Amino acid sequence: RTCFITPDVKSKPCPPGQEVCYTETWCDGFCGIRGKRVELGCAATCPTPKKTGIDIQCCSTDDCNTFPLRP
């Protein structure tokens, strides 16, 4: 599997056993100016948000976790 990985936002091979790509987004103090923070990566299973306000989307095809567009 290959997924986009931050901070480079480049497609890279995932480690063995990690077949899920994810896009994690959340707001910080600059959300109104810069938009949501974004983390892209690989995982063995879809991660669970650690706190409220974090949105995680998962997919399982190569490079499916593209950087989200600002609305």
Swiss-Prot record:
It comes from Pseudonaja textilis. Keywords: Acetylcholine receptor inhibiting toxin, Disulfide bond, Ion channel impairing toxin, Neurotoxin, Postsynaptic neurotoxin, Secreted, Toxin. Pfam families: Toxin_cobra-type. Belongs to the three-finger toxin family. Long-chain subfamily. Type II alpha-neurotoxin sub-subfamily. Expressed by the venom gland. The lineage of its organism: Eukaryota, Metazoa, Chordata, Craniata, Vertebrata. InterPro entries: Snake_3FTx, Snake_toxin-like_sf, Snake_toxin_con_site, Toxin_cobra-type. Its main location: secreted. GO terms for molecular function: acetylcholine receptor inhibitor activity; ion channel regulator activity; toxin activity. CDD domains: TFP_snake_toxin. Disulfide bonds join C3-C21, C14-C42, C27-C31, C46-C58, C59-C64. It is found in: Secreted. One of its GO terms (cellular component) is extracellular region. Binds with high affinity to muscular (alpha-1/CHRNA1) and neuronal (alpha-7/CHRNA7) nicotinic acetylcholine receptor (nAChR) and inhibits acetylcholine from binding to the receptor, thereby impairing neuromuscular and neuronal transmission. This is Pseudonajatoxin b.
